Amino acid sequence: MVKQHFNPTKYNLQVKISAVRSSSHCKHNINYHFIWIPKFRRKLLVGRIVDVLKDIIKGQCQELGLDLLAVEVMPDHIHLFVSAKPINNPADIIQKIKGNSSRQLRLVFPQLKRLGYPIKQYSSLWAIGYYVGSAGHVSQDSVLKYILEQQGKDVFEFNIFGGQTKIGDFTR
């Protein structure tokens, strides 16, 4: 059984995952699931820290032009689900979110500089590394079926009234 990290009904994920977004020159559906942990997997993310962290992440997503689909903060790890543009690199996304949230959280909660230890201060709240996975509404089987069905067909359809070309529909 696969563990669900996000409650699909709470976040309306089925609708959000299937939404195709538009940029100036393309249609896209790029969703990333990130997971990262505090240094030493300390159970520090509790109480008011959770609310402040969610606000920081929400603000950082807006600044980066990401659609925040879901965020869950556990005492010892964070799950973040975002929809990105094709120009957004997952490594850059997580670097900015981890760096910014570490800095801001430790300004608001100075006790996080010590990660719960009495003496030593640490330069970062988060452990090195992260998990990232991609998710979408189109399965590999759907893409393969679409490609095989397109043999001998034109790649683009042309709308004579609007003068627009459009790429075929993967969702069938």
Each predicted region: which residue ranges?
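Basic nucleic-acid-binding interfaces
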Residues: V2-R172
